[in-house]
């Protein structure tokens, strides 16, 4: 007897299934066999065609039900996993934005003025060596130090990393004069 139609039928059902899904399907099948009442088994056997041995229709039906349940469980699993990943990514993004926002909100007036000058100078900041504001910004990671230019040993050069440049641009673009005036007023008040 030629069994190629059985092979084709099994290939149809099992194509695209991973080993994990196949194991889940077999577990579902075993659970269905254990849980299904005997009366259902007998009722299905009454409708069993004569060409099939006893209870084959019952087991074929359970196989199909376990196949469908496995597909449903797999789809739900993937939907929930995608939802969790999207939620985790959104929470991570919100947390990173909050850290950046808190970092920029904690800047002093002098540090904000330095960043405004860097934005105005197309992301290049030159300060005299040892500037407290530049050192503070460097410690916070908002600016990175470039090697000193040849012939200018008393000048430190910095740039704003791309990670923070957009935030700096949104906060300080066009505000270097305003911040400089505020800094002058603050210095005058400190001298009094």
Swiss-Prot record:
| InterPro entries per record | SieB (IPR025982)
What keywords are assigned to this protein? Host membrane, Membrane, Transmembrane, Transmembrane helix
Tell me one Pfam family matched here. SieB
Transmembrane residues, as ranges?
Answer: 22-42, 51-71
In terms of superkingdom, the source organism counts as Viruses
Q: Where in the cell is it found?
A: Host membrane
Q: Which residues form the signal peptide?
A: none
Say where the protein is mainly found.
Answer: host cell
Q: Report one GO cellular component.
A: host cell membrane
- Membrane topology classification: Multi-pass membrane protein
Q: Does the keyword Ligase apply?
A: no
In UniProt terms, what function does this protein have? Has a role in the prevention of superinfection by phages that are insensitive to repression.
Protein known as: Superinfection exclusion protein B
Q: Which organism is it from?
A: Salmonella phage P22
């Amino acid at each position: 007897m030629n069994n190629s139609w059985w092979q084709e039928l099994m290939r149809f059902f099992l194509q695209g299934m991973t080993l994990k899904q196949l194991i889940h399907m077999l577990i579902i099948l075993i659970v269905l066999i254990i849980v299904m009442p005997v009366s259902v088994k007998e009722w299905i056997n009454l409708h069993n065609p004569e060409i099939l041995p006893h209870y084959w229709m019952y087991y074929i039906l359970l196989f199909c039900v376990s196949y469908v349940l496995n597909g449903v469980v797999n789809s739900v699993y993937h939907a929930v996993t995608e939802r969790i990943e999207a939620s985790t990514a959104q929470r991570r993004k919100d947390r990173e934005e909050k850290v950046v926002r808190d970092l920029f909100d904690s800047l002093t007036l002098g540090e904000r003025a330095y960043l405004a000058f860097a934005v105005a100078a197309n992301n290049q900041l030159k300060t005299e060596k040892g500037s407290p504001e530049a050192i503070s910004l460097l410690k916070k990671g908002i600016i990175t130090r470039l090697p000193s230019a040849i012939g200018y040993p008393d000048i430190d050069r910095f740039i704003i990393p791309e990670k923070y440049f957009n935030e700096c641009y949104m906060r300080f673009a066009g505000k270097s004069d305003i911040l400089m005036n505020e800094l002058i007023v603050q210095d005058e008040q400190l001298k009094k």
